[in-house]
């Protein structure tokens, strides 16, 4: 069995049980459930009646999140920063954090699916969001300058409001009719906000540089982040390059060179 299989484990859910929970707790009469395709580690995503997006968070998902968080904090320490990622003690704690995070992002003017309800089940948790019909993840979308600019604008807005995403990736950005939405943020300690902001920026620079020229990505980021922000982000790019889903998909040398040129640090 591969390490990936061990970490992911078996986090399948009984659809009949899910339907019953929705009937009992949310007052649904007819419940039609369809799975969402994707490489999902931290929840089981489902679409309900083509109206709601449901994330089922299992004990296995919570364990996997804890393992990932430990690895990220270790990476932050190795880079000379952190640790600043928070762990959660249970599936319902994870779900409540994501509910609150989405609510706060929307209050800050950052587009995110509207959170509807958190339901505590028998060990697992159920997190209900509005369903964004016709969405694509950024990894599946055509990337252009305006979309990338909007990603950095929203990230800046998030940070200016004292928030951080903590798990930025192309899969955690949705595009609907040209509008950009953030999803799946993780927990960040308040006293680690500055480092978390730099980590967010490093993730965005790395992920977007896997699709576009690093010089183009850095130029667009520079419209919203100053030289100090870009330099601080470089503290984390080596760690970011090890993340599942990014995994050496961008050139460290090219990204570092692009940042050096943008900040005037090129020799």
Name these PLM-found stretches.
Residues 121, 128-131, 135-137, 164-206, ...:
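Catalytic activation segment of kinase domains across protein kinase-like and atypical kinase folds
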Residues 17-25, 29, 120, 130, ...:
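An alpha-helical support segment within catalytic cores of ATP-dependent transferases
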Residues 95-112, 135-171, 176:
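Conserved kinase catalytic-core helix
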């Amino acid at each position: 069995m591969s390490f990936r299989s061990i970490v992911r484990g078996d986090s399948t859910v009984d659809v009949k049980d899910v339907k019953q929970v929705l009937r009992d707790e949310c007052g649904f009469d007819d419940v039609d459930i369809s799975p969402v395709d994707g490489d999902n580690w931290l929840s089981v995503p489902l679409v309900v009646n083509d109206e709601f997006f449901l994330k089922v968070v299992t004990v296995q998902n919570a364990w996997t999140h804890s393992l990932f968080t430990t690895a990220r904090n270790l990476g932050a320490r190795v880079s000379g920063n952190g640790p600043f990622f928070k762990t959660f003690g249970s599936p319902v704690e994870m779900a409540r954090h994501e509910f609150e995070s989405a609510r706060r992002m929307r209050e800050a003017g950052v587009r995110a699916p509207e959170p509807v309800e958190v339901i505590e089940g028998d060990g697992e948790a159920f997190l209900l969001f509005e369903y964004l019909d016709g969405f694509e993840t950024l990894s599946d979308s055509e990337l252009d300058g305006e979309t990338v600019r909007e990603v950095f604008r929203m990230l800046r807005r998030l940070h200016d409001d004292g928030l951080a995403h903590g798990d930025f990736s192309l899969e955690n950005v949705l595009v609907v009719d040209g509008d950009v939405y953030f999803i799946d943020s993780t927990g960040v300690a308040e006293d680690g906000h500055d480092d978390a902001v730099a980590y967010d920026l490093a993730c965005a620079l790395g992920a977007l540089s896997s699709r576009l020229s690093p010089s183009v990505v850095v130029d667009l980021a520079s419209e919203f982040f100053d030289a100090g922000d870009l330099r601080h982000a470089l503290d984390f790019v080596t760690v970011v390059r090890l993340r599942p889903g990014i995994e050496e998909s961008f050139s460290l040398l090219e990204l570092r060179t692009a940042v050096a040129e943008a900040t005037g640090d090129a020799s």
